[in-house]
Amino acid sequence: RPELVLPFVLDKNAAKAALKKYYRGKRFLPNAFSSQNHIEEIKGVYVPFWLFDANASGSGQYEATTSSSHRNGDYVITTTKHYDVRRAGTTQFMGVPVDGSTKMPNGHMDAIEPYDYRAFQPFSTAYLPGYMADKYDEDADTCQARAHSRMQNSVSSELSASITGYNSVSTLSENISIDYTAKHYALLPVWMLHTKWQGKEWADWQAGRRSAS
């Protein structure tokens, strides 16, 4: 049973209007995507997600360089200096989302983030009428691997981004530790429209993003 639900705020008419706006001006878009009858088939689905909280710490060693050039007669002299740079830091993650349904392409679900978690409500079946609702088929342990990768990449990016003032920076080593503090099973709202065209399945997700699978 889900712990939390993020109720639909965008109703079907608003979702259709957003989709039409996204399609507007795309002169070569096949009619299979934009016909009124097809857009009417848009569906609201509560997608199962696992949300992970964690404390993370990371440290890294980097090689940085600066270069300067000056002319000496007919020659251009370039001087490159190398620096040993160390960085370390800590951060906290709250509610890193990973969809728990194999029917939902992970890349598509990532693309429609972020969600406004301030609108979360304790789960109640009263929010479900009028919408489809999936149950997870990937458990928290399976999904935690994706959350772990996302957190590691985020910490690595923040460490690297803190190194400024050099012409180049290369990573020599990094050590990142993630300590999970909580996980939550939640239902998040997604508007979906599937289209078959030229033998491929296409999907529009909530804010009018389209991709092929």
Regions found by a protein language model. Give the residues of each.
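Charged, low-complexity helical/coil segments in non-catalytic cytosolic or luminal regions
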Residues: P2-K200
